[in-house]
Amino acid sequence: MSENTLSERNRTEGQRIAVVLFNLGGPDCPEAVKPFLFNLFSDKAIINVPQPFRWLIAKIISSRRAPVAREIYGHIGGRSPIVPETERQAEAIERVLSDLGEVKCFIAMRYWHPFADEAAAKVAAFNPDKIVLLPLYPQYSTTTTASSLKDWHQAWEKQVGPGRALSKSLETKEICCYPEAPGWIEAQAALIRHGASSFFSAWTSEKCGGGG
């Protein structure tokens, strides 16, 4: 372990650290599919045209795509798995970082609940010494990382400043981006190998069984 790493660890031990995980979000029920799509396509980072045209375009696209998307989600339980999966990631991060102090993860989705406003209010109630912003997008894009961080900073502005218990000077660190981070590519490759192996095993069994 490097001297810098030890110094950082000693400096953070005993602190309350809020880790905010950012992701796209997804509908949590069939009724949420259309408003989720509307939120997605009304984002200026996605469709960069002036209002009211962006609103109109988002309305048209979400209305047309909702029935098809709803049917697709129906094959996986009628909802997106992104929030439960992100909650599992949050729990794992808390376990790994528990020796640094009181570490708590919060989830901020971009286009459906829990939104950044909801996460910011929970972070404020936690009253951390430090905030770590962690977009779960390995590669940077204005439509993902940039949009999520901009949304967060707007939400956080409502929680700080005059008359608020939290200061704007609260230490905040953004982690971006990590497409070549140690272990990342290996982890993705392992998932692909596992998925491919499962698929081909099932395919082979089906073909062999059918051929018998």
Regions inferred by a protein language model and the residue ranges of each:
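Active-site-proximal alpha-helix that buttresses catalytic centers in soluble enzyme cores
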Residues: 2-212
